[in-house]
Amino acid sequence: MSTQSVVETVTALVKPILDDHHFYLTDVEFVKEGGGWYLRVYIDKTGGITLDECVMVSEALSEKLDAMDPDPIPQQYFLEVSSPGAERPLKHETDYEQAVGDYIHVSLFKKLDGKKVFEGTLKELLPDQLTLTVKDKSRKFDQVIDRQLIASARLAIEF
């Protein structure tokens, strides 16, 4: 089974578990690292997810995966269920919507105004662009970024 098929299968299995508890899925990864396979499921809820809640979801998902025949993941793997963390990636539209007003890090495919990386407060989100309020030494300014230029974005911790 391809990694994308595993992600799709796991997403379909975990969503009802999360919905029952008013949690939401932020990401699913199935990756090979250092000779081992890892199935990572990132979950959250308003106010933040707890370790006990991650354990509960892990056990429920593991039970569902074990009950499937044929096994959707024939190779051995480690199942990890966790919070996406303080610097969580912004991958979906809802991630960006929830990040309005938050400090974020944006990496671009190509330079914009001589830079490929911007950090600032997400001020405005439009379908084709976003606006960051950026601090540059002693001044603040709004930087408009075309969303097609964005290679990756994540929440960031402001220092």
Curated annotation (Swiss-Prot):
The keyword Isomerase does not apply. It comes from the Bacteria. This is Ribosome maturation factor RimP. InterPro entries: Ribosome_maturation_RimP, RimP_C, RimP_C_sf, RimP_N, RimP_N_sf. The lineage of its organism: Bacteria, Bacillati, Bacillota, Bacilli, Lactobacillales. Gene3D superfamilies: Ribosome maturation factor RimP, C-terminal domain, RimP-like superfamily, N-terminal. Disulfide bonds: none annotated. One of its GO terms (biological process) is ribosomal small subunit assembly. Its main location: cytoplasm. Keywords: Cytoplasm, Ribosome biogenesis. One of its GO terms (cellular component) is cytosol. Belongs to the RimP family. It is found in: Cytoplasm. Pfam families: DUF150_C, RimP_N. Required for maturation of 30S ribosomal subunits.
